[in-house]
UniProtKB/Swiss-Prot annotation:
Residues 1-159 form the Obg domain. The gene is obg. Its cofactor is Mg(2+). This is GTPase Obg. One of its GO terms (biological process) is ribosome biogenesis. It comes from the Bacteria. Residues 160-328 form the OBG-type G domain. An essential GTPase which binds GTP, GDP and possibly (p)ppGpp with moderate affinity, with high nucleotide exchange rates and a fairly low GTP hydrolysis rate. Plays a role in control of the cell cycle, stress response, ribosome biogenesis and in those bacteria that undergo differentiation, in morphogenesis control. It holds the Pfam family MMR_HSR1. Its main location: cytoplasm. NCBIfam families: Obg_CgtA (TIGR02729), PRK12297.1 (NF008955), PRK12299.1 (NF008956).
Length: 336
């Protein structure tokens, strides 16, 4: 399935049905009074977050959503039928912005969460409402009220517990594939991952977490280089960042600082999230290189550095256990 994390769509709720002009027509009643019914309500436009979706690709092909008009009133004071609502299903984590792309209208960050974006128009009044002591046979009825319309932007920010970040070719896709059921494309060249990937890591029957792998970041990502500003949005909701660094590179400290700089430039709150630093591809390093690089990275970051080999899975069980503990603790804190 193709991945799409932004889409512009048009939505319009239904107009209200028209009220009608009608009079009683009964045997032996020559001058029946007014009995025109009201129009029915127009359909609403509702957005709902549902599980099982992780892309906005459907909105590339369907971009206009319109609810129906309410039914017109009828004689005998019959009200027109209300039109059915139009419910638009979107992935959990979808944000809805106004056409200016800045005004946030709704954040559907939980399964089942809904927002009524365009309310259907009210039905018009039938002539029964206009009867008075001086006007016993009113020939007036109201048209239904118009519905609401607008263009909106949808932006998907994936919901994951762990955000996997790093430069291109750091081994993120390999780690995701061995740690979860995800099967991302893997090759030994930069930018193998072209869009965010989600994987579920299940340690046992009761413990699991979701990890998001975003395409490798490059310098200037926070300003849009390589679409980095869009990709970074997918780790904003993560509780912990897993920063993967290619241990075979000569300038590992520089690479760590580059990613930290981009996180800070994009959003200081994102940079302030807890970070686990992992030196990957350690199977390609000698014991002396391992020790020296781990020490240099720990000194620069002021944090513990874990050693990992995605290829041989060295250090993987320890890393997954640490990630699960972080996720469990974060959920416990949120629950108060």
């Amino acid at each position: 399935m193709k991945f799409l994390d932004q889409a512009k769509i048009y939505v319009r709720s239904g107009d209200g049905g028209d009220g009608v002009i009608a009079f009683r027509r009964e045997k032996y009643i020559e001058f029946g009074g007014p009995d025109g019914g009201d129009g029915g309500r127009g359909g609403d436009i509702i957005f709902r977050a549902v599980p099982g979706l992780n892309t906005l690709i459907d909105f590339r092909y369907t971009q206009h959503f319109k609810a129906r008009k309410g039914g017109n009133g009828a004689g005998s004071n019959r009200t027109g039928a209300a039109a059915a609502n139009v419910t638009i299903n979107v992935p959990v984590g979808t944000q809805i912005f106004d056409e200016d792309r800045e005004t946030l209208l709704a954040d559907l960050d939980a399964e089942g969460k809904e927002v009524l974006l365009c309310r259907g128009g009210d039905g018009g009044l039938g002539n029964t409402h206009f009867k008075s002591s001086t006007n016993r046979a009113p020939r007036r009825a109201d048209k239904g009220w118009p519905g609401e319309e607008r263009w909106v932007w949808l932006r998907l920010k994936l919901i994951a517990d762990i955000g996997l970040v790093g430069l291109p070719n750091a081994g993120k896709s390999t780690l995701l594939s061995v740690a979860s059921r995800a099967r991302p494309k893997i090759a030994d060249y930069p930018f193998t991952t072209l869009h965010p990937q989600l994987g579920v890591v299940r340690l046992n029957n009761t413990e699991e977490f979701v990890i998001a792998d975003i395409p490798g970041l490059i310098e200037g990502a926070s300003e849009g280089a390589g679409l980095g500003d869009r990709f970074l949005g997918h780790v904003e909701r993560c509780a912990t960042l897993l920063h993967l660094i290619d241990g075979t590179e000569s300038q590992i400290v520089k690479h760590w600082r580059l990613i930290r700089k981009e996180l800070e430039a994009y959003d200081p709150e994102l940079a302030a999230k807890p970070e686990i630093i992992v030196l990957n591809k350690c199977d390609s390093l000698t014991p002396t290189q391992r020790s020296a690089k781990k020490r240099a990275l720990a000194k620069a970051s002021g944090a513990e550095v874990m050693m990992l080999s995605g290829a041989t899975q060295e250090g993987l069980p320890e890393l997954l256990r640490l990630l699960q503990d972080r996720v469990t603790a974060a959920k416990r804190d949120r629950q108060g």
